[in-house]
Amino acid sequence: MPQTYTATAKFLHWLIAVFVFAQISLGLWMIGIPKAPPGIRVYWFNVHKSIGITLGLFILVRVVWRLTHRAPPLPATVPAWQRVAAKTSHVLLYVCMIVMPLSGYLGSSFTKYPIVYWGVRLPHWGWEAPALKELCSQVHLVTVTLFITLIAVHITAALKHLLVNRDGVFQRMWRRNLPAPGPTNS
């Protein structure tokens, strides 16, 4: 089994990471846009929806890839509790990556507003249901909050493996198969 992720897994990881960063940044920014004039707010919400749907498609590809390609093993030096923490956090990251775009899409489906995907109006299969829209919005908000927390933990753990442990874990997802630096002599 390779000691690094496949080129496809690395590409999907970093592509989705960039999209997620942009999407979360846009989402946090756009909630502060005044409701009047409505055209500006509608424009940015449609951009957010378009990025979300695109991201959802990339995530679907990533999930299928991950289910059909095993992750490389962690080094033997990684303690058992960290293995459990890594597996749990990865599962939760995937859950957030699925629930977040799905809850956003469903929430948009239960409003009177159309879903516009990069300028193309998608069929409106839902109906105006404020209670369902609010439920989906709350799920979306809770999920994004959990997702931001998990991303912070993920980045912190990756940097710990790169800068403190120096055990090659970070290099498994880097763009090239760099040799793992040896332990520090401190």
Annotate each language-model stretch with its function.
Residues 1-186:
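Membrane-embedded alpha-helical bundles that constitute the cytochrome b-like, heme-associated redox core
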